Each structure stands twice: as structure tokens, then as C-alpha cells.
């Protein structure tokens, strides 16, 4: 369809930007008022800057609901400036926090007074929305103009445009009387095309896509129940389009096709790198192909005949920050209405420009939707919890989920409601939102006065269990709220794995693992669904891939993400380096990251092992090969990092020059309780594993020369690993974190000959090796067979000396239990699984978790304290990687041939479990496995 998409990209008739990225702007107007209240930098009616222009002074205030602190609202005076004469025109220029205000051409303010952004809180220093607060006063406005860097965002005669929504309009003047209204100068894009049908339709199909999110409608009805189309890709290189059968939606005579565009990841916030990463403005492309019963056909496509308006209900929208919907601005898309003007033709997507260098043979492409679109998969009914603080009404949907809400309310026209979301509550019932960092995560609904009104945000996504309903610039009563439902949205909906055992906490853990997967497998496999991040972290995905494939059918979803990963490697354009996130986003280490970039080999391999589709390996082989070659290129040495007193510094140990040692950028065993495992150690272990996967892949694909090459490479890395860290007695030892505060150190000679003191980790010393160090070495088959028996002893000790508690982080989590079982330590694995004290898998379960936490100590129930807000998600699937062990070992379901064409059943029992049962639906059918212990007897049942 790509070559046949003969249509224009259309949007606003003028150039636009995202006002949440505009910190340099100008507002001008003429006015008549004794007390003008000009509002700017407005996130909503409780968070804004007010320029109060009175008869004899101008006062500037910051108004805030202070939600990220103590919920005590404040109105802070930023400055008062006296004037001596009457004024009727203003020109306000803002540059970040500096204010330059002219009244009738006379400078009144030139001060740096506006509030600054605060780390890990919603942004303040941007234009966002503007308006007028004329409560208990009146103002008459004309010639209102809003611009940034000579780009006019709004200039209205108040006849039919967006700014007319701020008040009542007559004769080119806007009157605001005892009212407070704000609008985003660049709201959603609304498009329509009216046309007639005069023949009998045989079939009709709509093809559509957008730069940004879109909702398409025929005659006012959505063409599907999808959310967030066209999905998330690297929009510089590839955008998906969707296909809809709309045969039954068209009518005889008059028809209209319409679309509403939101910013999405295209021009909205994307990761924590800011807004407009891919582009500045949303645009839409579509073709409606109609076939008539007489054999003729007609194509209605996006072109200059379409109409545009920005005076519409969705006045603001961001996937991270939330959606604002004003029901008073709803319209009939078929009706004649002065608000509609000619649309703008937007530039066709350009040849992709990569992050590094240039690409000579890569073109932008529109590709068909791969896998399921995002849809509502479950409705959770909210229950009222408490009112705290006053007029803040908190509801619990019962499950930490990802998606949106369905809110039913009643009230007067113009009343406005603010909806905030949290994963947890404080002990007093107030929602916990500090872990959202700068993501406002807030929706706004303004009522039109119907008996019952329903609001479902469609362009914003939230990760939440708790919903707080409050007034937006006003107080509301609980009676206004009829119901609050949580709508869980995901791209995956087919359960393939079931597990149950005699321990209800472990059963709840399995529930939490699955719901963490369902929620985060939305558009891409995100790390978390709630804060200003939500990126496709490669490290998270590679540790969870096997668990994810047991739980749910993720074949097409991950197949699409592997396209994203290939695109990310292409657009990163760094000699085969794989960036940390796909699609390519912010915070990518300069030269690829061990344990993260290895997703390029691990995820395709896990998908092939589960589904047996050789096309996965064929598609990914070049990516896999480029990554492994990049890892082992000679110029990679000395590019690595390690930690010094908790801070990252360049790796300069004596190992840095040894061939096959992976001295590279690495995040190490992220969020571990034992940070001793050197980055250089985990990176080398993963490099060996990637080489091992690649040699097996080469064998399957019949690439004999490559198989030989990568077999030798694996053996060489394994040998280097052993020489560096494996002792004759099977234990491992290493120089870990550099510190001046250690009691037991060793010395290492740097490249320049200087001596550095490193903490030395070895058995029978004050500092012992980590659980992760042993887990990686064992699970990646890096320990020689003649040493493995002794390694088993030391591996066991790494668990027991921590009282049967976990210390692993992200890189060790998926390998710990499998490695223990590999060396016959099933009893230790069960001990870890059944541990209930922190850190453990069951600690969060005991304390009410319904998904997997990012940290072992995201919340400490004993003290009621939360973890570090800079990184404290309560829906982070990585630590749920233990789930694979439920299926492979407790149930004993393992493939012998790829795709489970043949398989083995080898269940294990242990710990305090008296029964376990479950199943896995493979490509060849359902496999069930169940065992129980009763009166000392073991009974096993299986069904295939």
C-alpha cells in the first residue's frame, strides 16, 4: 500500500508548535478593564501565572495547587510594579523566566521573576495555555495575538476561531464577565471532508495514518475502537497505517469523513528528552476507497479540499501529561459551521536523518499495522475510598493498570473537573504522585450541562490504580461524580500461560507479573507506564522476553518491536551499536550498553524458541551480527565505565586492554541491592551469551562460515572471562567498585601506569561476590565443567549469606533461579521464591501490590515510606522475570524443538508447595502440567 498512498499530508493551515516546548513567546492585545487578569504558563486553572493589570499597578502571581508537595494551594506574589496612567494596550514578552511588559508602548516590567522548573515536577516555564481570569470583574479584549519567534500561533477577530471560546464575542471584541477561561493556542487538529454517495456501495475501505495520534470518524462515529493509532515508531524512518472496513458506516447521500489529531509521541513528550523529538506539528493522511456495485470505484483522499478547525472539544492533549476536553465546544461534523476553514498541506516526510552521520540508502516508509492495535481489554469499576484533602475525592479501581478512565458526571455548564492518577496512596488516603516526576498525568473535563456526561480521554495514557477527582479552578461536590471506571488498554489480549500453586502469595505474584506485562505492552514494551519516560528499554525487554512469551501471545507485538529495534540500530548509525531504547529515544549511552544492546540477539532468539518462526531470525540476523561485531571491535576498548563511590567514571583497570573483555558503556546490574558486580564483568558475560546465540542462529540459517566464526568468538570470550574472574576452585572474584572508604582493597594498574585501589570481592574475604556474578557465569555456561561442582557451593553461599534474600538487579533477575536449577540448587531457588521479607518477590505482594515494582524497596510498609522518587515505578515488569521459572521448572514445560513441535515435561517440587498446576498454549497446542504432594506421595498429571 505504501507506493499506492497517493494522498497529501494535511493539518493546520498555519505552522504550529507544541506550546509545552515554547519558553519564548509574546502576547499582545488591546483591552478595556479596570482589573485585567491575563493568564499564561497555564497547565490548568490551578497552575498558572497571573498578570493582574489594575488602575495603578501590575502584580504578577504564581498560582499552584502544590500537588507534588503537600496539596496546600498557594498564590505567590512574584512582583508588583506601579503605573501612573490609564492603559488600553499591552505587549507581554516572556523568555524563560524573564518578563518584559509594555503598556501602551511604555516599559513597565523587565525582570527575571517567573517560577523556574523544579526537578521531578511538572514544567512551569512554558507557554502551555493562556486566557483571562475575570472572576468578579469584566474585561473587553480585541486584537489578541499570540506568537513565538515570529510564528503566529493565534490571531483572532473573535468571530469563529479558537479564541472566541474565551468569552462572548460581538463586533470583533471578546467580553469576559465574571469568568475564568483558558485555551491552548495550539490545540488538537480537527479535519473533515464532506461528500455525497449516489450509488450502491459494494465495499469501502479506509486507509489512514498520522504524524501524531488520530481518531478517524465516518458520519460522526469512530471507525474502530482502537486507541493511539498509528502507534509508536521512529517517525523519522517509518510510520504505520491502519486499514478499516467502513462499508456499513456510509450512507446514501451526504457523508463526512473526519479526523481529530493529538500530539502523541510525534510532537508531544517522548521519554524524558522533552517534546517535539520527531516533529513540530501533527498531520494526517488517508484514502477512502469505495467500490460500487456497478463496478465503478471512487477514491476520497486527503488533499486541499479538506477543512480544518481548532475550535473543538479537545483543547489540549499529551500522551504523558493528559487531555483537556471542553464539551461546550462539541460540533456536528456534517453541519455548516463558520469554524471550518481550508486545511493546510503539510510537507511530505523527508529522507531520514539519523542521530549520527548520514544514511544514503534509507528512505521514509509507510508500513501496514503489524499485530494488534491498542484496545480496551478490561473494565475495572472504581470504588470511592475517601475525601482527603477536602473536596479531593479518591477512587480505587482495584488494579494497577494502564489506559484511561470512563468518567460519568453531572453538573452545570462550564463547571470543570480535574482528574489525577496515582499508583499508590499515602496512609491517609491521599494519592501518591511524586513518582510521576514531570509527567502531569492529569485530565480535564469541562461540562456542557447535559443530565449525564461521559468522558473517556483518547489521546492520553495513564498508569494508575487510584483516581482523584477534584475541581479545576473551583470546588466540586462528590454528588457530581456518578461513576469512575478504569479502562485497561493493551496491544496484547490472549493469555497463553496459566499457573497456580498452593501458596496464594505466589499466585498473586503470577497475577502481578501478567498485569505488569499487559499494561506495559502498549504500543511498545515500555519500562513503566506512568512517569515521564515510558520508553522501549532494551534491557528490560531482554530479561523479560521468555516470561512474557509464556504468559501471553506476544508474537506479533514483539515482531513489530523488533522492527523498531532494527530501525533504532539504523538510525543510531554507530557501527552496529544498539541504543538503549527502541524506538530511539533519549538517554542513550554514547556507544551502546552491555546487557541492553544484547536484546538484539536475546529477544529474537527467545521468540524463535517459543514460536518456531524462522522468519524472525532471518529478519534480525543482520542486526544481531552487527551488534556482536560491534561489541568485539578493537576500537571499543577503553570506552567503558565503572562506579567510583557510586559515580560513573571511565573504566581504566588493567583488564581494559585484554582482548575479548567487554570494556564498554554499561548500566550494570541496575537497581541491585549489591552493586559490586563490575560493569566490565556483566558486559563480558552478556557478550559471550550474544556470541553463543549468534553461532546457534548461524547454524539454523545454514551460514556455515559465520557459525564457525562465532563459535570461536564465544570460546575466546569465555576463555577471557575465565582468565579474568574464575578461580581454580570454581569461585569468582573481581575488583569491584572503586572507593577510598573500603576496608579491603586490591590494586590495579591503569593504562598510564598509575595504581588505583579497587574493592576486592572474593570468597572468604570481607567482600564476597554477588548473586548476579554467579548467576550470569552459570546460566551463560561460562564456568568449565570441571569447576562447576565447586561453583555450585559458592553460588549457594551467595544466597545463604544474605539470609535467603535477593540482592540481584535487572541483569541478574532472569538468570538467578534458572542458574540455581541448572546446578541442582532447586531447594535454594524455592527458598528465594517463598521469601517474604524485603528484598524478595513476595514482599510487595504481602503489601498489596497488583503489579511488579521497579525497586525491591519501592515502598517500605513498616515505615510507610516510598523509594527514591527519581525512579520508583509500581508497574515495572523486569523483576517479574522469575515467571519463566514457574513454567520451565515448577511445571517443567520446556521446548525440545523450536516452537514446541516437541517438548519435555520435567516438573520440580520443593519448598512449602503441596501442589502446582498450569498450562502453556504453544503454536502446536495446549500443554498442561499438574502435580501434588499428599501424605508423602507425589502425583503427576499432564495433558498434551
What name fits each language-model region?
Residues 204-213, 218-219, 404-423, 469-472, ...:
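Alpha-helical support elements that line or immediately flank enzyme active sites
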Amino acid at each position: 500500500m505504501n507506493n499506492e498512498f497517493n494522498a497529501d499530508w494535511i493539518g493546520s493551515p498555519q505552522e504550529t508548535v507544541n506550546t509545552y516546548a515554547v519558553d519564548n513567546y509574546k502576547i499582545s492585545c488591546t483591552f478595556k478593564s479596570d482589573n485585567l487578569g491575563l493568564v499564561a504558563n497555564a497547565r490548568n486553572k490551578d497552575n498558572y501565572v497571573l498578570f493582574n493589570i489594575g488602575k495603578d499597578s501590575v502584580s504578577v502571581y504564581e498560582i499552584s495547587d502544590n500537588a507534588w508537595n503537600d496539596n496546600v494551594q498557594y498564590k505567590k506574589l512574584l512582583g508588583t510594579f506601579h503605573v501612573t496612567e490609564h492603559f488600553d494596550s499591552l505587549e507581554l514578552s516572556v523568555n524563560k523566566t524573564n518578563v518584559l511588559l509594555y503598556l501602551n508602548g511604555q516599559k513597565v516590567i523587565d525582570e527575571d521573576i517567573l517560577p523556574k522548573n523544579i526537578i521531578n515536577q511538572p514544567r512551569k516555564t512554558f507557554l502551555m495555555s493562556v486566557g483571562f481570569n475575570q472572576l468578579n470583574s469584566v474585561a473587553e479584549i480585541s486584537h489578541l495575538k499570540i506568537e513565538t519567534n515570529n510564528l503566529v500561533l493565534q490571531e483572532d477577530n473573535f468571530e469563529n476561531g479558537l479564541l472566541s471560546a474565551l468569552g462572548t464575542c460581538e463586533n470583533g471584541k471578546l467580553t469576559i464577565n465574571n469568568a475564568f477561561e483558558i485555551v491552548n493556542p495550539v490545540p488538537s487538529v480537527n479535519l473533515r471532508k464532506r461528500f455525497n454517495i449516489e450509488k450502491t456501495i459494494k465495499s469501502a475501505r479506509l486507509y489512514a495514518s498520522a504524524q501524531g495520534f488520530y481518531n478517524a470518524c465516518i458520519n460522526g462515529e469512530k471507525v474502530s475502537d482502537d486507541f493511539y493509532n498509528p502507534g509508536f515508531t521512529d517517525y523519522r524512518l517509518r510510520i504505520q497505517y491502519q486499514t478499516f472496513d467502513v462499508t456499513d458506516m456510509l450512507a446514501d447521500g451526504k457523508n463526512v469523513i473526519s479526523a481529530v489529531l493529538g500530539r502523541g509521541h510525534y510532537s508531544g513528550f517522548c521519554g524524558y528528552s522533552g517534546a517535539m523529538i520527531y516533529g513540530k506539528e501533527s498531520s494526517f493522511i488517508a484514502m477512502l476507497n469505495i467500490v460500487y456495485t456497478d463496478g465503478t470505484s471512487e477514491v476520497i483522499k486527503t488533499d486541499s479540499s479538506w477543512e480544518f478547525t481548532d475550535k473543538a472539544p479537545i483543547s489540549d492533549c499529551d500522551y504523558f501529561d493528559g487531555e483537556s476536553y471542553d464539551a461546550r465546544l462539541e460540533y456536528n461534523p456534517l453541519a455548516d459551521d463558520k469554524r471550518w476553514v481550508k486545511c493546510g498541506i503539510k510537507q511530505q516526510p523527508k529522507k531520514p536523518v539519523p542521530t549520527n552521520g548520514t544514511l544514503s540508502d534509507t528512505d521514509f516508509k509507510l508500513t501496514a499495522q503489524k499485530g494488534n492495535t491498542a484496545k480496551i481489554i478490561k473494565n475495572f469499576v472504581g470504588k470511592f475510598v475517601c475525601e482527603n484533602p477536602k473536596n479531593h475525592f479518591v477512587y480505587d479501581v482495584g488494579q494497577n493498570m494502564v489506559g484511561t478512565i470512563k468518567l460519568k458526571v453531572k453538573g452545570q455548564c462550564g463547571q470543570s473537573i480535574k482528574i489525577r492518577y496515582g499508583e499508590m496512596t499515602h496512609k491517609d488516603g491521599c494519592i501518591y504522585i511524586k513518582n510521576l516526576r514531570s509527567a502531569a498525568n492529569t485530565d480535564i473535563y469541562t461540562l456542557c450541562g447535559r443530565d449525564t456526561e461521559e468522558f473517556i480521554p483518547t489521546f492520553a495514557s495513564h498508569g494508575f490504580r487510584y483516581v482523584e477527582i477534584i475541581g479545576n479552578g473551583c470546588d466540586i461536590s462528590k454528588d457530581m461524580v456518578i461513576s469512575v471506571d478504569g479502562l485497561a488498554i493493551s496491544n496484547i489480549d490472549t493469555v497463553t500461560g496459566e499457573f497456580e500453586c498452593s501458596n496464594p502469595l505466589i499466585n498473586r505474584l503470577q497475577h502481578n507479573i501478567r498485569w505488569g506485562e499487559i499494561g506495559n505492552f502498549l504500543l511498545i514494551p515500555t519500562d513503566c507506564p506512568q512517569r515521564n519516560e515510558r520508553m522501549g528499554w532494551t534491557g528490560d525487554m531482554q530479561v523479560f522476553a521468555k516470561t512474557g512469551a509464556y504468559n501471553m501471545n506476544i508474537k506479533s507485538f514483539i515482531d513489530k518491536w523488533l522492527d523498531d529495534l532494527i530501525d533504532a540500530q539504523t538510525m543510531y548509525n554507530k557501527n552496529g551499536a544498539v541504543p538503549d531504547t527502541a524506538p530511539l529515544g533519549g538517554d542513550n549511552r554514547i556507544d551502546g550498553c552491555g546487557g541492553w544492546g544484547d536484546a538484539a540477539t536475546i529477544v529474537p532468539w527467545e521468540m524463535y524458541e517459543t514460536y518456531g518462526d524462522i522468519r524472525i531470525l532471518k529478519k534480525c540476523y543482520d542486526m544481531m551480527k552487527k551488534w556482536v561485531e560491534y561489541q568485539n571491535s578493537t576500537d571499543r576498548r577503553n570506552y567503558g565505565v565503572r562506579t567510583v563511590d557510586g559515580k560513573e567514571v571511565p573504566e581504566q583497570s588493567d583488564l581494559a586492554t585484554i582482548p575479548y573483555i567487554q570494556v564498554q558503556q554499561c548500566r550494570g546490574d541496575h537497581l541491585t541491592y549489591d552493586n559490586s558486580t563490575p560493569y566490565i564483568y556483566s558486559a563480558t558475560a552478556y557478550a559471550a551469551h550474544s556470541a553463543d546465540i549468534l553461532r546457534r542462529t548461524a547454524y539454523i540459517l545454514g551460514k556455515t562460515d559465520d557459525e564457525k566464526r562465532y563459535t570461536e568468538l564465544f570460546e575466546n570470550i569465555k576463555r577471557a572471562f575465565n582468565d579474568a574472574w574464575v578461580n581454580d576452585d570454581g569461585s569468582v572474584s573481581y575488583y569491584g567498585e572503586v572507593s577510598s572508604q573500603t576496608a579491603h582493597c586490591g590494586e590495579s594498574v591503569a593504562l598510564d601506569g598509575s595504581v588505583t585501589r579497587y574493592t576486592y570481592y572474593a570468597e572468604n574475604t570481607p567482600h564476597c561476590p554477588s548473586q548476579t556474578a554467579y548467576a550470569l557465569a552459570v546460566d551463560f555456561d561460562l564456568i568449565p565443567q570441571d569447576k562447576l561442582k565447586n561453583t555450585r557451593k559458592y553460588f549457594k553461599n551467595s544466597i545463604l549469606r544474605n539470609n535467603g534474600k535477593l540482592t540481584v538487579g535487572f541483569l541478574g533477575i532472569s538468570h538467578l533461579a534458572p542458574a540455581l536449577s541448572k546446578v541442582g540448587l532447586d531447594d535454594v531457588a524455592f527458598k528465594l521464591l517463598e521469601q517474604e521479607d524485603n528484598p524478595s518477590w513476595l514482599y510487595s505482594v504481602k503489601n498489596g501490590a497488583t503489579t511488579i515494582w521497579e525497586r525491591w524497596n519501592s515502598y517500605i510498609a513498616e515505615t510507610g515510606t516510598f523509594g527514591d522518587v527519581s525512579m520508583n515505578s509500581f508497574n515495572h515488569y523486569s523483576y517479574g522475570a522469575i515467571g519463566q521459572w514457574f513454567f520451565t521448572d515448577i511445571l517443567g514445560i520446556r521446548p525440545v524443538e523450536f516452537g514446541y513441535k516437541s517438548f519435555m515435561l520435567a516438573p520440580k517440587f520443593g519448598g512449602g508447595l503441596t501442589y502446582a498446576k498450569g498450562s502453556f498454549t504453544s503454536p502446536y497446542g495446549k500443554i498442561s502440567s499438574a502435580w501434588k504432594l499428599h501424605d508423602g506421595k507425589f502425583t503427576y498429571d499432564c495433558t498434551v
